[in-house]
């Protein structure tokens, strides 16, 4: 029974590490997306300041602000998922080190 429990714990740990790797990759892409939106917004605002306000520019700036907000919201969701996975992994490791899951570490 202990061997089966150890194998299940090891499999679960492997699954969590893979999921964390995927979440971290999504986070990096999300940070790039947010940075791109920030740069585009800054350029649009500078252009508006230099060339003046126009309805088309105002609409573009509003769209860029929405994109930035969406990117930030997506990052918060990714960070929440990462926190959940990290906590689950820490709990699994804690149980393993306390001896309740055998000695596979």
Briefly describe each language-model feature range.
Residues 2-11, 86-105:
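Short, charged, intrinsically disordered terminal tails
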Residues 2-36, 69:
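Short, charge/polar-rich alpha-helical segments
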Residues 7, 14, 21-22, 43, ...:
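Non-transmembrane, elongated alpha-helical coiled-coil stalk/scaffold segments that mediate dimerization
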Residues 27, 60-90:
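Amphipathic alpha-helical coiled-coil segments
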Residues 27-63:
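Extended alpha-helical coiled-coil "stalk/arm" regions
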Residues 35, 42, 49, 76, ...:
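Alpha-helical coiled-coil oligomerization motifs
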Residues 52, 69, 94-95:
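Short, flexible coil/linker elements and helix-boundary hinge sites characteristic
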């Amino acid at each position: 029974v202990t061997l089966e429990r150890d194998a299940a714990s090891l499999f679960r740990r492997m699954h969590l590490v893979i999921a964390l790797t995927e979440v971290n990759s999504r986070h990096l892409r999300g940070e790039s997306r947010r940075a791109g939106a920030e740069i585009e917004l800054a350029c649009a605002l500078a252009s508006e300041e230099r060339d003046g306000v126009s309805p088309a520019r105002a609409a573009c700036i509003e769209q860029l602000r929405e994109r930035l907000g969406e990117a930030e919201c997506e990052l918060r969701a990714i960070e929440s998922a990462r926190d959940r996975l990290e906590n689950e992994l820490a709990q699994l490791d804690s149980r393993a080190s306390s001896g309740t899951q055998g000695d596979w570490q």
